[in-house]
Amino acid sequence: FDDDYEHFEQHMEQAIARVPALASTGVKQMINGPESFTPDGNFILGVAPECANMFVGAGFNAFGIASGGGAGWVLAEWVMKGEAPLDLWVVDIRRFSALHRDRQWVCDRTLEAYGKHYTVAYPHEEYESGRPRLASPLYTTLRGQGAVFGSKLGWERPNWFARDGQSPRDIYSMGRQNWFQAVGEEHRATREAVTLF
């Protein structure tokens, strides 16, 4: 794309505020182009399931330069040895399912992932777009009993159950989150009494 100094200006101003010497150095080269983002904000690495011996390294979500060395090493090892050198499921291309063939769902979820890219990443944070997508017949019953759901591969499943008087929603933080006490009680019941999974 053409250089876009107007778009870049706010970032340059913030950089100069932190490193004043940048004001006199100027911009020598601008690279302005498209970037690829994925529905879960993670890379896509590994062997394409539909095409033997085709290895993929894509969807770096604006971290391609920073992650290129490690991703290149992992792919090289995978190609040479026939298996990944470590557990890469979070970025493995095989993590995608038939759900990811739904263009509207992918678009909505990828826009949400892009929107979260430069925000605070809280532990256990769930995506909200495209939900609920797939739910068991017990979904409504469990929700009525205070279930707070998360989503895995499109399937809604209860993460925890809100107690009486507690709002049935996640409140994210870097410390103990609002589900900590409720999950502790569920754990204690499982350990000392009977629970059904």
Tell where the protein language model's regions lie, with residue ranges.
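Glycine/proline-enriched, intrinsically flexible loops and inter-domain linkers
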Residues: 86, 93-197
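C-terminal catalytic lobe of FAD-dependent flavoproteins
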Residues: 2-134
